[in-house]
Amino acid sequence: MIKIKNKTLSGNINAVQSKSMAHRYIICSALSKEYTKIYLKDISQDVKATIDAIKNLGTDVDIRDDYIIIRESNIKNNIFDCKQSGTTLRFMLPIATSLLDECSFIGHGRLPKRPINDIVNIMKKSSCIFSNDTLPFNIKNKFIC
């Protein structure tokens, strides 16, 4: 069991190279509002979609050869292009709608056909208004957990 105390953390960790974990590290770093350096040898198209999405939330991302730097910036855009990444869509949908009053999500390839009814229904119960049940859609009202 890991116990986390409420205090400022700093230092370096060696993280497993995993696309799934890369999404999580990038999103958590963006939400922390702290300067973060994440070592990634390869950036997949799915992870690139998450990087683009957090830029829309007002995060500056500097991509280097084997790492990325994430730091706070200003909100730039409320349109989230998840490309073909289901992970980006599932992670960013509740995050973006809890931070923004209105936003739009789009996707490509098979992503618009992938099921997300569970997330959409939960968000609708929280007063989010969706223009469609499948991508692309606009969402009004903040998601309140």
Regions found by a protein language model. Give the residues of each.
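Structural preference for solvent-exposed beta-strand-turn elements
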Residues: 1-145
